[in-house]
Amino acid sequence: MATHYSIIGGMIIVVLLMIIGSEGGRLLEKKNRTSAEAEHYNVRRYLAENGLGQTPPMGWNSWNHFGCDINENVVRETADAMVSTGLAALGYQYINLDDCWAELNRDSEGNMVPNAAAFPSGIKALADYVHSKGLKLGVYSDAGNQTCSKRMPGSLGHEEQDAKTFASWGVDYLKYDNCENLGISVKERYPPMGKALLSSGRPIFFSMCEWGWEDPQIWAKSIGNSWRTTGDIEDNWNSMTSIADSNDKWASYAGPGGWNDPDMLEVGNGGMTTEEYRSHFSIWALAKAPLLVGCDIRAMDDTTHELISNAEVIAVNQDKLGVQGKKVKSTNDLEVWAGPLSDNKVAVILWNRSSSRATVTASWSDIGLQQGTTVDARDLWEHSTQSLVSGEISAEIDSHACKMYVLTPRS
């Protein structure tokens, strides 16, 4: 019998309890279910009908680095760089415009209009260019009467019209923000856009950005493909770790077709150390977060490229099982994060969030392995393998750094 993983069983039971309306219920312990059985266990999932997001989306978003200082040349050059740096071949496919791409006023027919100075060729021409590179284009709007910058109109009351416009341009992704919302509940403002996108005639990934205000992870699965669980990330250690913790508590609600979104990556923007960025990327990958690069990839340094192009870490994020890893142990800022992968493997992060070098240990009981299991431990950052590891895995780790492993049980 394949090795039993309590993590897989536990997370599946959480989903089942949610569906039958027993969110506060006691998790029933399931014995003797192999991980293969767990992977195929028939649990109903309420997912958006567009079939997108079977793994977390990967790509780039303009906001963290450029803010409103964005134009079509930057976007074209970013698409070029996505291909030339090898990121596209690793799965980074979305080139996403954030706020400020449109004129403040709609045209005489009520349609959104690209900013004439920044996007003189229009969004359709830009989408055509991005598509010619084998990539996909995303745009931004807001479930209010204006966007957060107040420089372009929101889509509240124009959902069907705007969705048809986006589809006619060849848009593949919509980030939908939450500003200028007139005090109307997100549960009233977001479903109309989800429905409009489904009726637009084009598959468009729907990224809901309501900042976790009304616990979208509970109700958004039938509406969108991802949902922000927190406010905006900032390019510093305290913001990144706080968001990681806030997002973690909703781990059981994520899965293929619908993902928790702790916001875009800050790797390469300069506000954290290399090891802090390594931790940032590792935790986002394990948490099955959308991997949307937020730096200027046209000018990124070698270290940034090395961090965001680690194929082994990306593979954890894109694993087909689609179970979000989570924090399973924390003692004095020494943490263990773990989650199950396909083929009975387990991903583990040993994270030192303390202010000094320390040893971090994950015992098999922490991460859901049976005590007698022997594994091969693949270090995803060192690209090395320890064979025949049993009982626990341990490492001495610098302050704010981490180690990330994939454990493969010996048969």
UniProtKB/Swiss-Prot annotation:
The keyword Glycoprotein applies. Glycans are attached at N32, N145, N352. Disulfide bonds join C68-C100, C148-C179. Residues 1-24 form the signal peptide. Its EC number is 3.2.1.22. The active site is at D177, D232. One of its GO terms (molecular function) is alpha-galactosidase activity. This is Alpha-galactosidase. It comes from Cyamopsis tetragonoloba (Guar).
